[in-house]
């Protein structure tokens, strides 16, 4: 868990605080054990979702009680935030959709694979997250993938915290980093999807405004990697168009693991 605060008494400036990456598994590994029970068929989806909601409540309350100024939401995940963002953007390969499972089980099929009455598919590949020991699920973009805003996880978890009297800023992996993390399995290169992903993030910001969300945080750790002129041009294109949207919701750009190149 990272975060911090600093003050400069001479100038009367007090810096505000946030946490980058609050642990989601639970102090007693509640998420791990509940998920394993679900996979074994010992509990249903509703009980798993209740465990998740209880953990989110604890995590938000812990930060509020610690005096954190900008508490995050949408940082909870059953498996991986990259996979969460892929689902949010409708980046779901056809072989998983064809299983015709529930949204939750389709998500887990992408993360763990699925062998059952509906079919037999392997999980998506995993890679090291920016050379750390954490591994993320690699999203697959097919030629007929339509990248667009899909699902309500982000606003639902914001509303969940709001109902507890806790104001939050939703967090999502940013568009530039998502393009860098995806694997493009067809003939189309990443650049063919730039306008679609910009449109999806524009709609995300608009949806935040519709739900009276003051801040949304985009995580862009790919900015700490070496960037050539084309990379820099792509980043500027994405954010020039994204920030051109007239909205009351403010965008917080977050990086980690190093300095912006």
Predicted regions and their residues:
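Residue-identity detector for glycine
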Residues: 3-4, 12
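Domain-level signal for soluble alpha/beta catalytic cores
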Residues: 11-261
